[in-house]
Design a protein with these regions (language model features):
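Substrate-recognition "cap/lid" segment bordering the active-site pocket of phosphatases
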Residues: 98-150, 181
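Acidic, Mg2+-coordinating phosphoryl-transfer loop and its flanking beta/alpha structural elements
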Residues: 89-94, 148-189
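Short, well-ordered alpha-helical microsegments
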Residues: 97-101, 159-160, 195
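Alpha-helical substrate-recognition element adjacent to the catalytic core
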Residues: 2-116, 120-121
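Short acidic-hydrophobic, aromatic-tinged amphipathic segments that line or gate anion-handling sites
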Residues: 113, 185-194
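Short amphipathic alpha-helix with an adjacent loop that forms part of the alpha/beta core around
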Residues: 195-202
Length: 202
């Protein structure tokens, strides 16, 4: 009997712009342009980001103001809508609840598994809290334990364990360095091509 399917998608770079790159462009702090496409160690990346925010006196509302100006990538909402009409879709992201709400609203409120920030009364981000380490791979494994076939797509280093755990994983909008390092995953740049690849697995 054919198993039911869940699709898991990364958020930033796949459906919406990279939040930290947008914030870096707004503030002029070039070091904030580093993302999980550049740094495979997420703790190193986040500790560096928090140190930069402190050094420049920037707080959560400053980031939220920039997020409020962002929109999903062109074609993302239609792609997600068509995919959700075919199968269950869950967004697995290393973003934070405090960042995601405006973008989730624009995408039609898909289910999102992500992390949490510690923020003091003045709005300073004091720390970040992972819901669990390697949560993307862990979520896929949990869905598989419920007898789901899992299809996945992402663009960054932090997606590759999710893609490897999934029954089928694809790269989407991934930079050339990641495509070269992980040639086992088929890579796409257009939503219609990714949708066709998913449909072929359903």
């Amino acid at each position: 009997m054919k198993r039911q399917t869940i699709v898991t998608l990364d958020l930033e770079g796949v459906l919406v712009p990279e939040i930290w790159i947008a914030f870096a462009d707004k503030t002029g702090i070039a070091e904030l342009r580093r993302t999980t496409r550049d740094e495979p160690d997420y703790d190193v990346l986040m500790r560096g980001r928090l140190a930069l925010l402190d050094a420049h006196g920037l707080k959560l509302p400053d980031i939220q103001d920039v997020i409020g100006t962002l929109a999903p990538l062109e074609g993302a909402k239609a792609f997600l809508g068509e995919l959700r009409a075919l199968t269950q879709v869950i967004i697995l992201s290393d973003t934070f609840e405090e960042f995601a709400q405006p973008l989730m609203r624009q995408l039609g409120w898909p289910t999102l598994f992500c992390h949490h920030l510690d923020v003091d009364a003045a709005g300073r981000i004091t720390d970040y809290r992972l819901r669990q380490p390697n949560q993307k791979q862990q979520a896929v494994a949990a869905f598989q334990s419920l007898n789901y076939q899992v299809l996945a797509a992402g663009d960054s280093f932090n997606d590759t364990t999710m893609l490897a755990q999934a029954d089928t994983g694809f790269l989407f909008h991934a930079p050339e360095g990641i495509r070269t390092q992980f040639p086992q995953f088929r890579a796409f740049d257009r939503y219609e091509d990714l949708l066709a690849a998913f449909k072929a697995c359903l």
